[in-house]
Amino acid sequence: MERILLYVHFNKCNHISGHVFYQLEQLKLLFSKIIFISNSSLSNEDKCRLREDLGISDLLERDNRGFDFAAWRDGMNWLGFDTLQNSDSLTLMNDTCFGPLWDLASIYQRFEEDSQVDFWGMTNFRKTRYFEEHLQSYFVTFKKSVLKDKAFREFWSQVEDFADVQDVIDHYETKFTKRFLEAGFRYQALLDTRQEEAGELLHPDFSYYKPLKILEAKLPFLKVKALTGNPFLARYLLEELETSSSYPTSLIREHLFYHFGPDLPCLLQDKYLSQATSNYRADQPVLLHIHVTDFPIFQHYQDKLFSLSSQYQYLVTVAQPEMLKQLQTALAHLGDKVQLVLSQASHAWLAMLDQKEILQDYAYIGHLSTHQLVENQAVFDQAMRSDLINMMVYYADTSIEALEQESAVGLVIPDLPRLVRDGLFESEPPRPRLAAIWQEAGLHKSFDFMTPPSLTRVYGGFVWFKYSALASLFQMKSLESLPSSEQELSDVLEHLLVYLAWDSHYDFKIMPLSSLPSLLDWQRKKAELTEQKEKLSQKNLSQKIRNRLSNLLKKK
């Protein structure tokens, strides 16, 4: 069979994801010719891989004008409609799906043998008050009967370069099926969603809202947005694929991490460190930085902090000359294992950043301090610090092992302190400030700090890290524009760390605080829901009383 594939690619980072290369590797077995149309720039490395590794020599780069439909139009014009008419089928596809999850050859054979079908796709969209019934365009195949008809050329010849994607949806995505039906052709969808129950759906898009149905029906493609748009369901989708499909789910995780962020819910399950190990010897030097703002607190934890093995060197900074003298006396017995520095900066992280010349000689670095973590609550402040320091020390060797053994890991952060998990310490992330600093820093990736329900915070800034993972922070010119208030500065930096590492393609691991069962989270959630219901009930009661009084006054 002479099958042609017009494959449209777009990537805001001008990068071809691993799942796309895998997809093309599987698809090339089915097609006589693949034309790769990119609506974003391609690197020379990616072009070389397409040509040499996959044998795809037909590459068409264009601006993202008119989106997928204009790209397919340009692909047809570039190939020529006469060539299309002489082929047995033309498949239009984009890179918005993972797959193939299951065998695709048998599906082609089934539809090619069915004389009652002229064009077909994976899923259709039922008629609504807003849209006509239509095949979803992420995968559509036209047979020769359609390709030879003048209606096919007429439709594609009038496709415009719309600047608004909604115009593309309104004019082409939702209209092409009806256009070819009116021309006398017949279509089928591998999953005919018209026959499926959709009463509870806000929008009858099964590829997005019903991904479990997609897997149950063994459709070979799963939309990327089915995972990003259903963040707490995504983990179960991955588990189902690992059980029922041979598709390498690592490609999904890599794509989600690279393009959508390091802390999607479906990625968190793999971030806990393994059981704590002891006496791991790193091949490269390790440094623990401690910034001392309160000498009695430092004394309280001194024995624990300096109980680490001989591979650990220490850098202790302090901003007060009198406290420096106290530290010199307290640490004199440790000799050259400890470097003591009088810092010009009082904030713990600024004090560390000032020591760039020392830190860059170490592959792995830890950071903690004695600064106040919870304002005006001494008991809470002590409880949080205790949790954080205990994790930093207990998991020190395991953290260094993860940093050294896993090239992709750049940070190891503490789990949520008990105080946070109990709902007794909450603070809203400084989202506008984070977004502004990110923009000013001119980083590689874009990240939306405004939309996610939560952002990952490194409490206290306590962390083990690779210098290379946070090199951008040490070089960041916009540090001068950071808040002057120490608490505001902490809020910003603690919310930036995992995203700065992610921008440099580093992931993070979590030191578990396992003393709290997950049942506690469920109990807290139920308590919050109950509280919300009570507030709503009180609000409704107050409104009823006001309405009643208003009616009584009117009667007078």
Specify the residue positions occupied by each region the protein language model found.
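ER/Golgi luminal nucleotide-sugar-dependent glycosyltransferases, focusing on the catalytic module
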Residues: 1-556
